[in-house]
A protein has these predicted regions:
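PTP/DSP superfamily signal
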Residues: 53, 64-72, 91-144
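Cysteine-based protein phosphatase catalytic domain of the PTP/DSP
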Residues: 11-72
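Single conserved hydrophobic/aromatic residue that forms the stacking wall/gate
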Residues: 1-13
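A phosphate-binding catalytic loop at a beta-strand-loop-alpha-helix junction
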Residues: 71-90
């Protein structure tokens, strides 16, 4: 797998990332960087600061561009690995794997990742997304 999702990083996760050849990490948390956890590794860090209650299309496009332009297998995460990570994963599946919005929403909410139903805004963002426009912006976007 070239992409994967996760909860926040810790020492155990860091060792596992190195063990499985993960070379890049995309952090979706607003408050905490991965600098301390990645210290002493060759893992390349990326960050798009997001909040689950207000994740924007611009932030999603930025995250998807990072994933598209990665040079090594990447894992993306927030704190719980369910809401912000779920949104990025859903859009990844829609944009890169041509999964339907309905299937991506079902996977995000019923896939066992702990989606918090209070974040109806994420479901609405997916339902209302102009997939072709987002795909165009992601694909035309160079490295960030």
């Amino acid at each position: 797998r070239d992409t994967d999702r996760s909860r926040g990083l810790g020492d155990v996760y860091k060792r596992q990332l190195e063990k499985y050849g993960i070379g890049e990490v995309l952090n979706l948390r607003n408050r905490h960087s991965d600098d301390d956890e990645a210290k002493g590794t060759s893992i390349k860090l990326h960050r798009v600061k997001t909040k689950a209650h207000s994740i924007s299309e611009k932030q999603l496009i930025q995250a998807l561009r990072i994933i598209k332009n990665r040079k090594a297998p990447i894992v993306f995460h927030c704190h719980h690995g369910s809401d912000r990570t779920g949104a990025v994963c859903a859009f990844y599946r829609i944009i890169f794997q041509n999964v339907s919005k309905e299937d991506a929403i079902h996977e995000m909410t019923e896939g066992g990742y702990g989606f918090h139903r209070i974040y109806k805004n994420i479901i609405r963002r997916i339902k209302e997304a102009n997939v072709e426009q987002i795909r165009k912006e992601v694909m035309e976007g160079g490295e960030l």
